[in-house]
Amino acid sequence: MFMKRILYIIIIIIFSVNTFAQNKSMTDTVYSIQEVEILGASKKKVEIGKLNVPLQYLPMSVSTVSYKDLEIRGISNIEDAVKFLPGVRMNTSYGAFQTLYVRGMTYTPIMIDGVRDERTMINSYPFSDLTNVESMELLKGPASVLYGHSVLGGVLNIVRKSPTPQTVVNMKMSYGSWNNKQANMDFGGNLAGPLNYRVNFNYGDQDGWRATGNKRLSGYLALGADIDATSRIDVRGSFHRDWYGTETGLPPVMMADVYNTDGTLYLKAGQEIPGLNEKKRYNNESDFLKNNGWDISGKYEKKFSKSMKLTNYLSYKYDDINYLGTEELSYLYNMNSVYKHYIDKGTYKMYINLDSVQLTYPLRFSHIAKTLGNQLELSGDFYTGNIKHNFLGGYSFSQMFRNSYTGYNNAPENDKFNSEYDIYGPGIYSVIAVNNPLSMGYMKSKFSKAIITKDYTHGIYFQDLIEFHEKFKFLLAARYDIYKYLRTGANTYGGIRKYHKSEQTPYSIATNSAFTYRAGMVFIPISELSIYTSAASYFRPSRTFPAANTIYLNKNGSDIDIESGKGIFHPETGYQFEAGTRYTYKSILQASASVFYIRKNDIVRSFGRLSVGSDANGNPVMKSIIGQVGSEESKGFDIEVAITPTHFSSFNLGYSYTDTKTLDIQPNKYVNIDTQNITLVPHNTFYAYGNIVVPKGVFSGLSYNLSISFMDKVYTNYAKSMSFSSYWLTDMGISYPLKNGIRLSGNVNNVFDKTYSNQAVYGTQRVPGMPRNFMLSLAYSLR
């Protein structure tokens, strides 16, 4: 096995990719301190309050992957794209809800064109396709503090395609395994005078490996113009209409040792029922997830001189999630020996039926989020004596109004057809066979409660990159954030997403504010090498109010009295350090390495839904457990290397080691917390990808691409009753240009047909990863 892995890596080194024109050289590239895009890599430039200095002047770690590298591999989903960023893991749950982990830290914010998506700070959310994206850029470590509260470990910036004066015509149609169909159109050019544009449309439809039947539709328009020699305006808008079949996974692993009736051990705790068909789907026929949304933004730039610029960025985003999902699969229990297996409870035996599962906890909710944001920034440079200062000062404002509608009042099992309840019908509490699951009928649903929340954030910030000497640069930055969170509730009417404002309860209000800092230094002994270090503080406001069927724990492990009327949790605080180096040799070699340490205090963690007792029939009573469990630290290092041995080949690899632990944990009566590992965080991640293009001859333009990724073992719950085993995945593709701008390509993913999993429901219901699959594409480009 080890020799196979070495062989894979050697193959990539031999067959490595990207034409010379596509390679991103860092030697003389100008970077923005709040942008990650390498300007020399494209015809356009995304600026986010930029400081025009070379990358080697900046004490920060940057990782980049271009959409071109993703497109030739047939990747348009964010969870597949981030595997080419070191120390990153995207956790997907219920089929489409996604949470980004960077350097062991969860709820990493995601930005679109430099503007934070405030939704990603509080919940997992679906993300639409990446076909309108130019590049993805990860800013890691203390540099991420530039983007406001709750940023720790890193921040991911998704840079969309910009208006272009050059004519662009790209069309692509693809067909793949499980009836996967995709079509994409990308146009750009000059409309009239100084006005340029970019348009993108994408459609996707598939049966899916596990018959989820996901569908996607998206559109994007960007307009840009130079008003005069000193002013520019850029307007962008997009929409998406996505439908997902949701995912409840396979029957849960055993929460305790299971015995045969003769007393012999059948399954150990954490083991799965043997012989499960990984393609079988256990969801109800009524399950669905709809995600519709649109956004619009405008950016205005005014240059007062070569050394000073004013930028204002106004944005609005609307997002609508509508969800009904079979989440919990439960085994049937009985105190009498009516089943073939049992769990030893010490003083008695609890018999368990492993031949079927019951759909016990369907969930119905909807979130409508409306986010308004604005950034006003002044940047430039000035001198104090012979010392140059590159400064940026700004004010940011964001408001997110989110209405959440819930239908959690499920019909009881003995009255499951009663339409007075939120979820009812023959499908609820239905029992289906483990080996041949078939839907036992529909579920109907409605909403009964509305939760109305309002988030307001004001931030003032300033940073100064001081060129003290040609070999020494210093960076100082400070930020002050004021955060206000309001929450109220009301009953809906008619079972739909409507409520009467006159029936709202009084607002619960949480207000937090904090000062955060950042400091860094860069040493440049030679022009090809820079060494840097930086540090920053961290703040995450508290926004937790009491919820039904939830138990809250304080940092001492005791239950919190939520009737006291006081706030439940304290804000999280913390700090992070980083030291790194960057080396560039001509256009042949680019290498970087960094070590980091992160600590945050008063962390809040969800331990999932756990059994807190039994009802009169012996069935477990389930409640959500949330606790402010103590502190958490993460430490490790990242390495990235890019090699361009010829004009027609290149090689990229990255490795990250992350050790994340909880600290200062007090015991509680509900769950044992192991301080050695945090859930869903791998110790080791690795990627390598490359391509070779035939430069001339009969097969001129023929290209090959190959990529390898490794994900280490991760635990899915704090009890460590289930984990995802480590796995390697290998993908490859080939592409050949035909006449008149037409290109034919094919991709094979999971070449060696590895069995793996990377998501689970409740940490116990494993969702199998896709086996070997194929994609064929026909593309046209106007040259």
Task: Name each model-derived stretch.
Residues 303, 309-315, 319-325, 532, ...:
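Membrane-embedded beta-barrel scaffold of Gram-negative outer-membrane proteins
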Residues 363, 367, 379, 391, ...:
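Conserved C-terminal beta-signal and adjacent last beta-strands/turns
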Residues 224-226, 230-303, 318-369, 417-448, ...:
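Acidic/polar loop-and-plug regions of large Gram-negative outer-membrane beta-barrel proteins
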Residues 90, 99, 115-140, 159-160:
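Short acidic/polar hinge/loop motifs at secondary-structure boundaries
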Residues 470, 597-599, 617-717, 752:
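Gram-negative outer-membrane beta-barrel transporters
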Residues 119, 131-133, 145-219, 227-232, ...:
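Outer-membrane beta-barrel translocator/receptor signature
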Residues 37-69:
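N-terminal periplasmic "start-of-domain" segments of outer-membrane beta-barrel proteins
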Residues 226-228, 369, 388-392, 396-400, ...:
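Structural signature of Gram-negative outer-membrane beta-barrels, strongest in the C-terminal barrel
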